[in-house]
Design a protein with these regions (language model features):
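Active-site acidic/histidine proton-transfer and metal-coordination neighborhood
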Residues: 12-17, 72-74, 87-188, 279-280
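Active-site-proximal loop/turn and secondary-structure-junction residues that shape catalytic pockets
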Residues: 28-30, 54-56, 84-87, 122-124, ...
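Histidine-acidic metal/acid-base catalytic patches
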Residues: 2-23, 28, 32-43, 113, ...
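Conserved beta-strand positions in the central sheet of alpha/beta enzyme cores
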Residues: 51, 80-82, 117, 155, ...
Length: 281
């Protein structure tokens, strides 16, 4: 299955993005839009990339041809994908994890996607916290080995307990500790400021101390998961810190826009650029 050369997907930061890279998690866009329309919206808002779930696993050959052509025409990159959900602390799910990864890799390679998003998902009730941590570390080492030859990373995303009461990893503090134990360049942390604010707060200090382990950041305000400025998180300060730290990976907008999506997403992108550039001049 190959419709376009992989070299087509080398999207760099757009000139108007001042060297920064921005993406949109597609599930946050109106459900009435087709995949192609979602891509057009992302491009119209000035974004470099998009993040997908598992929708590409259901594409027909004709879907692949059409969607890859649209990505190529718009110069968009698929920066991350979500290959599945398995309890990383549960060794009985190891085969399911392997199957998810093996099934996801061909499509990810076709899309030029180099990063998978995983949550630790559900706790194993009979495990102690120490056993749970050890099991997650072991599973991520296993996953890193599986992905080595394909050059794909995993970013571990903590989920707050308000969203998922049985979540095994709920804070970036623990996620950073886990990735250090895994000690693989293939395993990093997805710092989702929305989840971390709901769970623990203290967003900037943890970012400052652990920037080398951050593989991706997600943006949404609290409460409501809407655009920055609608809630309590001071994203201006967060963006300035990202600028000070010379963060050069994707900044993904994972919020439900209030208002016209293109207008709102463009404004969010420009706000981030302005704040980061203010400390880099």
């Amino acid at each position: 299955m190959s419709f376009l050369p992989s070299s087509s997907f080398t999207a760099a930061a757009l000139p108007e993005n001042e060297g920064h890279k921005f993406s949109i998690m597609l599930w946050t866009l109106p459900k009435s839009l087709t995949f192609e329309q979602q891509l057009e919206l992302a491009s119209a808002a000035g974004f470099n990339g998009v993040e997908v779930g598992r929708e590409y696993e259901k594409w027909t050959p004709e879907d692949w041809k059409r969607n890859l052509a649209k990505l190529h025409a718009l110069g968009l990159e698929v920066d991350s994908a979500v290959p599945g959900r398995n309890a990383l602390a549960d060794h009985s799910k190891r085969t399911a994890l392997r199957d998810d990864l093996m099934n996801a890799i061909p499509g990810a390679k076709e899309l030029g996607c180099k990063q998978f998003i995983y949550t630790a998902f559900t706790r194993v009730p009979e495990q102690t916290p120490e056993q749970q941590r050890a099991a997650i570390v072991d599973t991520l080492k296993y996953a890193a080995d599986l992905l080595e030859k394909d050059g794909i990373e995993i970013v571990l995303e903590p989920i707050d307990l308000l969203e998922h009461k049985q979540e095994a990893v709920t804070s970036v503090t623990e996620a950073f500790e886990i990735t250090r134990e895994v000690a693989s360049p293939r395993i990093k942390v997805l710092y989702d400021f929305y989840h971390e604010q709901r769970q623990a707060g203290n967003l900037i200090e943890k970012l400052d101390k652990n920037i080398a382990k951050v593989g991706l950041v997600h943006i949404a305000d609290v409460p409501g998961r809407h655009q920055p400025g609608t809630g309590e998180v001071n994203y201006g300060n967060i963006y300035r810190k990202l600028g000070e730290l010379h963060y050069d990976r994707y900044i993904c907008m994972e919020f439900s826009p209030i208002g016209d999506p293109v207008t709102v997403l463009k404004a969010a992108r420009l706000e981030a650029i302005s704040a980061m550039q203010s400390v880099q001049k």
